[in-house]
Amino acid sequence: MCVMTEEARDEVDRLVAAWRTERPDLDVEPLQVLSRVSRLAKHLDRARRAAFAEHDLEPWEFDVLTALRRAGKPYELSPGTLLRATLVTSGTMTNRIDRLAQAGLVRRRPDPEDRRGVLVSLTDTGLSRVDAAFADLLRREHELLSGLGAADQRTLASLLRTLLAPFDSPS
């Protein structure tokens, strides 16, 4: 068993110790990992929101713009592909595309291969805004991980990938 110094203890260690005292009949070991993941997720969410706000973007706007950016030149996708990439409904995606178009971040054009369809693409403004926000986000994420060396980051990424695999598998 690992003995921790007071400096190495964190709020989760105190939480786990309290539950072990109050409910010794329960295995509270999952809290060691998942409470820390939950706390980190809150810090990441704050970092993401700060990066996006600095570039006048909402999280949902960033999600749509990055889906287009990752598509590569000409940074263009169908609304159906966008909704699958962002896991929202058709009505929600239509509303989001409308709002992004009004803001001058995306444009629509007829799909030359499907007369009934449209394609959505980044404008120059959308491209520069998403690129700047993404660079800022990565800077903040590097700060969040600064307590871990590169090897530990790779190990953690591998463990988290294993943990997430059942949830990310196609149904």
Feature map (PLM): residue ranges:
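Short amphipathic alpha-helical segments with heptad-repeat character
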Residues: L31-L34, S38, K42, L87, ...
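Short amphipathic alpha-helical elements of helix-turn-helix/winged-helix folds
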Residues: A67-A71, L159, P166
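Generic C-terminal helix-cap and adjacent flexible tail
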Residues: A165-S171
